[in-house]
Amino acid sequence: MDILYLEWSKVDEAIWTMCDLIKKDYDFDVIVGISRGGLIPAVRISHIFDNKRLLLMEAKYYKDIGVRDDKPQITLTLKKEDVLGKKILLVDDVADTGVTLVAVKEYIEGLSPKEVRVAVVASKPISIVKPDYTVFNTDKWIIFPWEKMPVEKRK
């Protein structure tokens, strides 16, 4: 498995680039970060935009590196009044298969927001979701700087 290790500086630069893209065409009301991987990018985006309306959802799909459940399990949800009629920026670290993003986006859309757009630091060609905003496009397994330990130490 090919691995791409991203350093803090590269991720921060990517988030700034993504924010420049977002500023051009999307004036969102609420940021929703997907736990765990999307939380750091979501917090960073909230500071860059000075948008304190940051919510989180938890969805679990991967059990371990390359090991998935049958489908994503959404274990922490939102209240309808938090997103009703609002423009949502859904943030995650990576659109890998895209299955988690689809499940979370469909859940949010069921709460009647005005619009939901997706921002991810990295996207893979196999993803069934084409994010509205992304910077890195790769088919490699990505290790972000906030992740516990490199793949080699997990075996």
Q: Language-model features: where?
A:
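PRPP-associated nucleotide enzymes
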Residues: 1-155
